[in-house]
Design a protein with these regions (language model features):
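Short, low-order "capping/linker" segments at domain edges
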Residues: 99-103, 197-208, 313-324
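M16 family metallopeptidases and their MPP-like homologs
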Residues: 1-7, 19, 35-76, 110-132, ...
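Acidic/histidine-enriched alpha-helical segments
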Residues: 11, 80-99, 184-193, 290-319, ...
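A residue-level signal for conserved active-site and pocket-lining positions in enzyme catalytic cores
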Residues: 94, 142, 213, 312, ...
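Active-site glycine-rich loop that binds ribose-phosphate moieties when present
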Residues: 135-145
Length: 381
């Protein structure tokens, strides 16, 4: 969704409406031959798709007729069919989806935070766009975006499960059409390191306040498997359910089981987010920031480091028991230029000094923003 300004090879910069990647995902399931979901129903496969900030994924799972389902996938993603009538029909559907997300407190608390964090980067814009931006989408613009990004050189096929490589390659070689290789340049405006504003709140129909505390990082803060592994260990020892910070927040009745944390990064953006429900979100945010300051002053406890390292290693290896997770991880790592098995090795080989370096260059308490969604006050409903 963030690729709304781009150029191809050495051409001019092209600007397309916000939300067009998500719109294209919806429309690609339709073709002159019918709906791809109807075709999947005939093979018994469970199909879906999603658009994130940096990629669109089309997926299916099945227990039988894998070859037929793979043929459906490889066929419809290469067979766009857009007309003025079908595009106009979709605008109402996606418009309702946008309004639905506008009424979702978890969604709003995150995007309010991103708007407070990023001056120019399009990551602050809703993946689905706005009702106004999708009104600008035409069949011609969909074809333009499709022809640039839906190129085999910009795509990856990830398969996991009880199937052989030879079987997959045989189907792929038969159905995939050769593509001329182009270089796609994403165009982002200069993004300052500093946040926009330190605080934002919005009233919602919620029973308890929800907060997101976001620490803005440099865009290239986490590069490669080693830095990714060291960052994951750092965040686990900082805020997992076994951490001292988590226990302090819980004992102070400032969080509940909804509390979470994540590294949120992609092309041109990077941040660390803590969030969940809290009766006193400002106090929770202050406790998190104070703990980070003390951790930087006092250093990382060796025992806590070892627990975090072993936990991240175990969780990562255990995740490989899920075929769904494997496929998603493979796709994520491919587009980031990382390798899943190298990442696991980096976890195993991580030292407390490696993780301390991550701590020293991240989590600037003077460059964070707090977003709060709070209950509507009496008399304002």
């Amino acid at each position: 969704s963030i690729n709304t300004k781009f150029s191809v090879d050495d051409g001019e910069t092209i600007t397309v409406p916000d939300g067009i990647a998500h719109y294209l995902e919806h429309k690609l399931f339709e073709s002159e031959d019918g709906d791809a979901f109807v075709r999947y129903a005939q093979t018994g496969a469970n199909a879906n798709a999603y658009t994130s900030f940096e990629k669109t994924c089309y997926l299916f799972s099945c227990t039988e007729k894998f070859d037929e389902s793979l043929e459906i996938l490889l066929d419809f993603v290469q067979s766009p069919y857009f007309t003025a009538q079908t595009v106009a029909k979709e605008q109402g559907i996606i418009g309702q989806e946008i309004k639905m997300y506008d009424d979702a407190p978890d969604w709003r608390v995150m995007f309010n935070m991103l708007e407070n964090m990023y001056h120019n980067h399009p990551v602050k814009i809703d993946i689905a766009g706005t009702v106004e931006s999708i009104a600008e989408i035409t069949a011609e613009k969909l074809y333009e975006v499709y022809n640039v990004f839906y190129n085999l050189n910009n795509m990856v096929l990830c398969v996991s499960g009880n199937v052989t490589v030879d079987k997959v390659l045989k189907t792929a070689d038969r159905l995939l059409k050769s593509s001329e290789k182009h270089t796609i340049h994403n165009v982002f405006e200069n993004e300052p390191y500093e946040i926009v504003k330190p605080y934002v709140e919005q009233e919602f129909s919620v029973s308890m306040p929800i907060f997101n505390l976001g620490f803005k990082e440099k865009a290239d803060c986490v590069k490669g498997d080693a830095q990714a592994a060291h960052t994951d260990i750092l965040l686990f020892l900082l805020a997992s359910e076994t951490s001292e910070l988590y226990r302090k927040l819980l004992d102070a009745n400032l969080i509940n089981s909804s509390f979470s944390y994540e590294l949120f990064d992609g092309p041109g953006y990077c941040s660390v987010i803590f969030g969940g429900e809290s009766r006193e979100p400002q106090k929770a945010a202050e406790m998190i920031k104070d703990y980070i300051v003390k951790l930087k002053e006092n250093g990382i406890d060796k025992e806590e480091f070892e627990i975090a390292k072993k936990s991240i290693y175990g969780d990562t290896v255990a995740s490989l028991n899920s075929v769904d997770t494997i496929s998603n991880i493979l796709a994520d790592y491919h587009f980031k230029g990382n390798n899943m098995f190298d990442y696991i090795d980096e976890i195993a080989n991580a030292t407390i000094e490696d993780v301390t370096k991550r701590l020293d260059c991240m989590l600037d308490v003077n460059n964070c923003t707090l977003s709060v969604v709070k209950p509507i006050q009496d008399g304002e409903k």
